[in-house]
C-alpha cells in the first residue's frame, strides 16, 4: 500500500524491509525515494536475489552477514524422493508423529488443473486424512483470515499433526514443533522459494527434515536446483 504515489511521508528517516527478495529493485527504490537523501534503508533476507548481490558488489549497499543461527538449532537435512515412493514418506511421517512431531506438506496448487500435472493441496488433504484421521488440516490462499488463524492456532497447540498447504506458509510462520516439511513438485519452484519453505522447519532443537518430491522426468536444471538444496543450508551459497 505504501508504494502508491499518493502516499507521502512528513519525515521518513528509516525504512526496514524484511523478506526483501519478495520486492523488486525498482519497488525498493520507489520507497526509498519517498524519504529523500537522508533516508536510511535496511534490507533483511535469508536468501538474497542475485541482482541484489550485484548491487552489493558494486558498492550501492553495505553488506552484513549473520551466519550464526540461534543456539540449539540444527541444519535441516534435505532429501529428494520420487513421487512413486510416497509409501516410504508415509511410513516416515508415522514415525515422526509417534515421536510427537508435526509436519508441513506443501503443494503448488489449491485445486486440480487439467492443464498442469501437479498434485493439488485439496486432493492431497483428502488422501492424507484417510490415512491419518483427525490429524490433518488444510490451508491455502482462499482460506479466510479468521479460519486461517484458527487453523494455525490449533497447529501451534498441537491439536493436529499434518498441515497441508500451498506456499502461503512460505513466510511469517514459526512453529518450533514442526520439524518435517514435504514439498511436492519441488522441481517447479525456484531456489529462493524452496529455501524459504525449508526454513519453516528447523526452528526448534530437534532434528529436522525437508523432503523434495519430484517426477522422474526432470530436466538437467531441475536436477541441479534440487542438488544445490540437498548440499547446502546457506542462503548466500544458494543465491
Regions found by a protein language model. Give the residues of each.
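Inter-lobe coupling/hinge segments of SF2-like helicase ATPases
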Residues: 1-227
Amino acid at each position: 500500500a505504501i508504494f502508491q504515489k499518493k502516499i507521502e511521508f512528513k519525515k521518513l528517516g528509516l525504512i526496514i524491509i524484511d523478506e526483501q527478495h519478495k520486492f523488486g529493485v525498482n519497488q525498493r527504490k520507489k520507497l526509498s525515494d519517498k524519504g529523500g537523501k537522508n533516508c536510511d534503508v535496511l534490507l533483511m533476507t535469508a536468501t538474497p536475489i542475485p541482482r541484489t548481490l550485484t548491487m552489493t558488489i558494486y558498492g550501492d549497499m553495505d553488506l552484513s552477514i549473520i551466519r550464526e543461527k540461534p543456539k540449539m538449532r540444527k541444519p535441516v537435512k534435505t532429501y529428494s524422493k520420487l513421487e512413486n515412493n510416497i509409501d516410504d514418506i508415509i511410513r516416515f511421517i508415522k514415525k515422526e508423529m509417534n515421536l510427537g512431531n508435526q509436519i508441513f506438506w506443501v503443494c503448488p496448487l489449491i485445486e486440480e488443473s487439467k492443464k498442469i500435472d501437479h498434485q493439488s493441496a485439496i486432493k492431497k488433504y483428502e488422501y492424507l486424512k484417510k490415512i491419518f484421521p483427525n490429524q490433518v488440516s488444510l490451508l491455502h490462499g482462499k482460506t479466510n483470515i479468521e479460519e486461517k488463524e484458527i487453523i494455525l492456532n490449533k497447529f501451534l497447540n498441537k491439536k493436529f499433526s499434518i498441515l497441508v498447504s500451498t506456499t502461503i506458509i512460505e513466510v511469517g510462520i514459526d512453529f518450533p514443533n514442526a520439524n518435517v516439511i514435504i514439498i511436492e513438485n519441488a522441481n517447479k519452484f525456484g531456489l529462493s522459494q524452496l529455501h524459504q519453505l525449508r526454513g519453516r522447519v528447523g526452528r526448534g532443537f530437534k532434528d529436522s527434515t525437508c523432503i523434495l518430491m519430484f517426477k522422474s522426468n526432470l530436466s538437467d536444471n531441475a536436477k541441479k536446483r534440487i542438488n544445490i538444496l540437498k548440499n547446502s543450508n546457506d542462503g548466500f551459497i544458494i543465491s
